[in-house]
Amino acid sequence: ALREALRQLPERERQVIALRFYHGLTQQRAAGILHISQVQVSRLERRAVERLREWLAT
Protein backbone atom coordinates (compact mmCIF):
# COMPACT_ATOMS: atom_id res chain seq x y z
CA ALA A 1 0.00 0.00 0.00
CA LEU A 2 2.78 2.45 0.90
CA ARG A 3 4.73 1.77 -2.30
CA GLU A 4 1.65 2.39 -4.41
CA ALA A 5 0.88 5.59 -2.50
CA LEU A 6 4.46 6.81 -3.00
CA ARG A 7 4.17 6.20 -6.74
CA GLN A 8 1.11 8.45 -6.83
CA LEU A 9 2.95 11.43 -5.33
CA PRO A 10 4.12 14.20 -7.65
CA GLU A 11 7.77 13.70 -8.63
CA ARG A 12 9.17 16.52 -6.48
CA GLU A 13 7.31 15.34 -3.36
CA ARG A 14 8.51 11.79 -3.99
CA GLN A 15 12.11 13.04 -4.27
CA VAL A 16 11.82 14.91 -0.96
CA ILE A 17 10.37 11.86 0.82
CA ALA A 18 13.14 9.64 -0.58
CA LEU A 19 15.91 11.99 0.51
CA ARG A 20 14.44 12.70 3.92
CA PHE A 21 13.20 9.29 5.01
CA TYR A 22 15.01 6.69 2.90
CA HIS A 23 18.39 8.43 2.92
CA GLY A 24 17.97 10.17 6.28
CA LEU A 25 19.07 13.60 5.08
CA THR A 26 18.23 16.87 6.77
CA GLN A 27 15.90 19.31 5.08
CA GLN A 28 18.88 21.57 4.46
CA ARG A 29 20.88 18.82 2.75
CA ALA A 30 17.89 17.71 0.68
CA ALA A 31 17.38 21.33 -0.38
CA GLY A 32 20.98 21.53 -1.59
CA ILE A 33 20.65 18.36 -3.64
CA LEU A 34 17.36 19.48 -5.20
CA HIS A 35 18.53 23.10 -5.65
CA ILE A 36 15.56 24.52 -3.76
CA SER A 37 15.20 26.29 -0.42
CA GLN A 38 14.86 24.49 2.90
CA VAL A 39 11.45 26.15 3.29
CA GLN A 40 10.33 24.61 0.01
CA VAL A 41 11.55 21.18 1.15
CA SER A 42 9.53 21.63 4.33
CA ARG A 43 6.39 22.51 2.37
CA LEU A 44 6.81 19.63 -0.07
CA GLU A 45 7.44 17.20 2.78
CA ARG A 46 4.38 18.38 4.69
CA ARG A 47 2.16 18.09 1.59
CA ALA A 48 3.50 14.63 0.77
CA VAL A 49 2.99 13.32 4.29
CA GLU A 50 -0.56 14.71 4.35
CA ARG A 51 -1.35 13.01 1.03
CA LEU A 52 0.13 9.70 2.19
CA ARG A 53 -1.86 9.81 5.43
CA GLU A 54 -5.09 10.44 3.51
CA TRP A 55 -4.44 7.68 0.97
CA LEU A 56 -3.35 5.12 3.54
CA ALA A 57 -6.29 5.87 5.86
CA THR A 58 -8.82 4.86 3.20
Predicted regions and their residues:
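Short, Lys/Arg-enriched C-terminal cap helix and immediately downstream tail that follows
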Residues: 14, 49-58
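Short alpha-helical "recognition helix" segments of helix-turn-helix
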Residues: 29-32
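Amphipathic alpha-helical segment used for protein-protein interaction
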Residues: 1-15
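Short, locally clustered residues in the helix-turn-helix/winged-helix DNA-binding domain
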Residues: 7, 21-22, 53
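A short, glycine-centered helix-capping/turn motif at helix boundaries
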Residues: 10, 23-26
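Residues within the DNA-recognition helix of helix-turn-helix
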Residues: 44-47
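Helix-turn-helix DNA-binding motif, specifically the short coil turn and the N-cap/start of the second
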Residues: 26, 36-40
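A short pre-motif secondary-structure segment
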Residues: 16-20
